[in-house]
Amino acid sequence: MNDYTKYTIGVLSLQGAVSEHIAQIETLGAKAIAVKSLSELQQVDALVLPGGESTAMRRLMHSSGLFQALKSFDKPILGTCAGLILLANKLEGGEPPHLAKMNIQVQRNAFGRQVDSFQTDLMIKGFADPFPAVFIRAPYISRIGSEVEVLAEWQGNVVFAKQGNLLACAFHPELTSDTRVVELFLQQLKE
C-alpha cells in the first residue's frame, strides 16, 4: 500500500458528501480537511469537488470568494457527480461552464431523477475487478477532447475520465467501502 501520510487533501465543503470523502481519504492514510475558505484551499496538495447541485455550488463558490482560486488551482482534482459538471468546459443545453478545467462536454441529470438512482458494477480501466458505482441524478460525459482519457463507460456513455492531473466521475465513489477510485486520485500526487 502507498504512503500518503505526508499529503493534505481538501474536500470542497459547500455541499455534498463531504464527511464520506474525508473518511475515505483518511482510510488511505492522508490527512483530509474540509475546504470552505481560501486559507484552507492554500493548505492542500489536492482537492475533491464533491456531489451536490452544480449551479448552487457555483453561487456558493462565488459568495465564499473561492471561485477564482479554484479556477487557477493547478494541483490534482477529483470531481464526483456535480464536481464533474464543475470541471467541464462545456455543458449541454447552453448553460455556461463553471470552472472549465477539463476538455469535456457534460449532460446533466443524464440518468434521470433522484428516484432513478442506482448502483452497478462498473469496469474501470486499470482495475482488475468491477467497482460498485453509485449513480445519483448523475451526469455523463457526452464529448471528450483528444487529451482526455476515458477510464469507464456505462451503457455506451463516458462516466469516468482523466485529463492530466484531473479525474472526473459521474458516480459517487465515497458512498461505497471500495477506496480504489480515491487511491487512483491520490496516486496523482506521486506522478
Curated annotation (Swiss-Prot):
It comes from the Bacteria. Pathway: Cofactor biosynthesis; pyridoxal 5'-phosphate biosynthesis. Catalyzes the hydrolysis of glutamine to glutamate and ammonia as part of the biosynthesis of pyridoxal 5'-phosphate. The resulting ammonia molecule is channeled to the active site of PdxS. It catalyses: aldehydo-D-ribose 5-phosphate + D-glyceraldehyde 3-phosphate + L-glutamine = pyridoxal 5'-phosphate + L-glutamate + phosphate + 3 H2O + H(+); L-glutamine + H2O = L-glutamate + NH4(+). Belongs to the glutaminase PdxT/SNO family. InterPro entries: Class_I_gatase-like (IPR029062), PdxT/SNO (IPR002161), PdxT/SNO_CS (IPR021196). L-glutamine binds at residues 52-54, 108, 136-137. It holds the Pfam family SNO. One of its GO terms (molecular function) is pyridoxal 5'-phosphate synthase (glutamine hydrolysing) activity. This is Pyridoxal 5'-phosphate synthase subunit PdxT. Gene3D superfamilies: 3.40.50.880. GO terms for biological process: glutamine catabolic process; pyridoxal phosphate biosynthetic process; pyridoxine metabolic process. The keyword Endoplasmic reticulum does not apply. Coiled coil: none annotated. GO terms for cellular component: cytosol; glutaminase complex. Its EC number is 4.3.3.6, 3.5.1.2. In the presence of PdxS, forms a dodecamer of heterodimers. Only shows activity in the heterodimer. Keywords: Glutamine amidotransferase, Hydrolase, Lyase, Pyridoxal phosphate. The active site is at residues 81, 172, 174.
